[in-house]
UniProtKB/Swiss-Prot annotation:
PANTHER family: FLAGELLAR L-RING PROTEIN (PTHR34933:SF1)
Localisation: Cell outer membrane; Bacterial flagellum basal body
Family: Belongs to the FlgH family.
Protein name from the UniProt record: Flagellar L-ring protein
InterPro entries on file: Flag_Lring
Pfam families: FlgH
Lipid attachment residues per UniProt (N-palmitoyl cysteine): 16
PROSITE patterns with a match to the protein in the record: PROKAR_LIPOPROTEIN
Source organism (scientific name): Campylobacter jejuni subsp. doylei (strain ATCC BAA-1458 / RM4099 / 269.97)
Record keywords: Bacterial flagellum, Cell outer membrane, Lipoprotein, Membrane, Palmitate, Signal
Length: 232
């Protein structure tokens, strides 16, 4: 029984304290689902007009205007992080107990006790000191640049667009996945039907890889078990 517990307990601790890889939900924000879609105004044009509502009118804005229209997002994200922490603690304790601690009130007793103290004048002193100094620093610079075509999923009642798009590439056995969603204003879309990612509200950008490189960078399960139960 003891041998069984010896082998099972580490895995039990690992199951309680195992870490999960960070995840991101591409689900639309709550307000996007709650807001009613904008009602489209179907205005009929006069027959023979140059501004008709055909599939390719002569005079029209090339920017996305309706549901299922495409918008190209230029992703230019960069993050810079620098943190530093210092901690120092110190504690010192001193205790003294002198010899000759016996005393008396009357003269005879006091005289006798003085003689005893002279022979038993034993005292002690203790000193303890604890010091701790810790320093930590971290710096990180990351950048991610790419473009992705998204689709207008919903036009909100205030005229803003909820967009969503994804792209998957398979190169030499490595699969790259890019997903993006968020809310944009139609006024921020350029004349070439592109928009910078900095103008996307509630932006969610996911980039991950699947393949040999991704598997080689993951920690083996044995290392995770040791880290989970290692107390120091």
């Amino acid at each position: 029984m003891k041998k069984v517990l010896f082998y099972v307990l580490p895995f039990a601790f690992f199951g309680c304290s195992a870490t999960v890889d960070p995840q991101i939900s591409m689900k639309p924000p709550a307000y996007v689902e709650e807001l009613a879609p904008k009602q489209s105004n179907n205005v009929e044009s006069a027959p023979g007009s140059l501004f008709g509502k055909g599939d390719n009118p002569l005079f029209s804005d090339k920017k996305a205007m309706n549901v299922n229209d495409l918008v190209t997002v230029i992703i230019q994200e960069s993050t810079t992080q620098s943190t530093q922490a210092n901690k120092a603690t110190s504690r010192t304790n001193t205790s003294n107990l002198d010899g000759g601690t016996l005393t008396g009130s009357s003269g005879v007793v006091a005289s006798a006790l003085d003689k005893v103290n002279a022979y038993s004048n034993i005292g002690f002193q203790t000193n303890s000191s604890n010091n701790y100094t810790g320093t930590g620093s971290q710096s990180r610079n990351e950048s991610f640049n790419t473009t992705i075509s998204t689709r207008v999923i919903k036009i909100l009642s205030n005229g803003n667009y909820f967009i969503e798009g994804s792209r998957e590439l398979l190169i030499n056995g490595e699969k790259q996945i890019i997903q993006l969603s968020g809310v944009i204003r139609p006024y921020d879309i350029g004349q070439d039907n592109t928009i910078d990612s900095k103008y996307i509200a509630d932006a969610k950008i996911l980039y991950k890889t699947e393949g040999e490189v991704d598997r080689s960078t993951r920690k083996p399960w044995g290392s995770k078990v040791i880290e989970a139960i290692w107390p120091f």
